[in-house]
Design a protein with these regions (language model features):
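Start-transfer (signal-anchor) and selected internal transmembrane alpha helices
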Residues: 1-16, 21-43, 130-141
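Active-site lumenal/periplasmic loops and adjacent helix-entry segments of GT-C-fold
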Residues: 44-196
C-alpha cells in the first residue's frame, strides 16, 4: 500500500499535490485522478450497496450475509429435500470482508467489501498499466470502456431482444450462449469473478 500511495511516479505527469505537511507524503496529481476514477467506477457498480444494485447482487449479498451469520464452512441442512448442501464461493474474494463482518455489522461488512474490491481494482489497473507501459489512469479508462464489439453483432444479427434503443439492455444475446462481456459489465454483475480473475 505504501508503495502505491507514496512512491508512485507517473510516467506522464510529474506534478504533485501536497496533502499533508509531513515530509514525503505527496501524491502525484495523476495518482489522485486514478484513485478517484477507480473509486467512482466501483461506487457505480453497486458493490457495498452505495448505489443501485442490479438483480444479480441478490445472490452476492446472500453469500456475504451467510458468511457473516453462520459458522464456517457454511452448509445448509434440509433433510426433507436431500443431502446437506455447502455454500460455494470464491474464498479469496469473500472471506476478508466476511471475517470483518463476523465481529461488526452489515454496514461495516459492505464497506469492507467495497474497500477490498477497490484494492483489487487498484492492483489490477496498476499491473495493466505496468504491462502496457502507460499511466494507471489510462489503464483504468481502458478497462472501463473496452468491450467485445457486441454492438456490431447486434446491428448485423438483429433479434427482438436486445434493442439498441433505449440503451438499457444487454447486447450479448445476439450470439446465443456465447458472451464476451466488457469488464464494466462483469464488474457490475459478477464482480466476485471479475476482480480476482
Amino acid at each position: 500500500y505504501k508503495l502505491l500511495v507514496t512512491n508512485y511516479q507517473s510516467p506522464i505527469s510529474t506534478s504533485t499535490l501536497a496533502l499533508s505537511e509531513v515530509e514525503g507524503f505527496h501524491f502525484p496529481l495523476s495518482t489522485i485522478s486514478w484513485l478517484l476514477l477507480t473509486a467512482l467506477w466501483l461506487l457505480l457498480s453497486g458493490i457495498g450497496g452505495y448505489a443501485f444494485q442490479n438483480w444479480d447482487h441478490n445472490w452476492r449479498n446472500v453469500v456475504l450475509r451467510d458468511l457473516m451469520n453462520f459458522n464456517w464452512p457454511v452448509y445448509y441442512a434440509q433433510p426433507e429435500s436431500g443431502p446437506v448442501k455447502m455454500l460455494v464461493y470464491y474464498v479469496g474474494f469473500w472471506l476478508p470482508s466476511a471475517l470483518i463482518a463476523k465481529f461488526t455489522n452489515w454496514q461495516i461488512a459492505n464497506f469492507a467489501l467495497f474497500a477490498w474490491s477497490l484494492l483489487g481494482l487498484l492492483l489490477v489497473t496498476h499491473q495493466l498499466a505496468s504491462a502496457l507501459k502507460t499511466s494507471n489512469f489510462k489503464a483504468t479508462l481502458l478497462l472501463i470502456f473496452f468491450s467485445g464489439l457486441d454492438i456490431l453483432g447486434t446491428l448485423f444479427f438483429p433479434q427482438e431482444y436486445p434493442t439498441l434503443f433505449p440503451p438499457i439492455t444487454h447486447l450479448e444475446a445476439w450470439a446465443g450462449n456465447l458472451q464476451y462481456s466488457s469488464f464494466t459489465t462483469q464488474l457490475f454483475w459478477v464482480f466476485n469473478q471479475a476482480i480476482p480473475a
